[in-house]
């Protein structure tokens, strides 16, 4: 069996790892063993934080919607409840964007939500409301 010399592939692999570790502090940027450990850990953080990022953005959208809705005298939970009962399906990202950039359109949604909540209070049941809306 022929001898395999790994000089070229090993050098390429090391170069790839060191390129990924560029910008790291201290030994982690120029020593292969430390750089490999640091790059592996950074990939773990990146994987985890892609999930965390989604949670953080959803929380931010909810805070923005809550702040905008309180100007109309509603809470976030009541507003979402009213939208669901009115049959309006708009996701939180769009609602947050509307609250910031299109206050008039957002106000119309708040009024629709209030109307649905008030009508439901009068009607008594959700089934009566559904038949009245259609």
Curated annotation (Swiss-Prot):
CDD domains: Ribosomal_L20. GO terms for cellular component: ribonucleoprotein complex; ribosome. InterPro entries: Ribosomal_bL20 (IPR005813), RIBOSOMAL_L20_CS (IPR049946), Ribosomal_protein_bL20_C (IPR035566). The keyword Ribosomal protein applies. One of its GO terms (biological process) is ribosomal large subunit assembly. Keywords: Ribonucleoprotein, Ribosomal protein, RNA-binding, rRNA-binding. Disulfide bonds: none annotated. The keyword Ribonucleoprotein applies. PROSITE patterns: RIBOSOMAL_L20. GO terms for molecular function: rRNA binding; structural constituent of ribosome. Belongs to the bacterial ribosomal protein bL20 family. Binds directly to 23S ribosomal RNA and is necessary for the in vitro assembly process of the 50S ribosomal subunit. It is not involved in the protein synthesizing functions of that subunit. This is Large ribosomal subunit protein bL20. It comes from Sinorhizobium fredii (strain NBRC 101917 / NGR234).
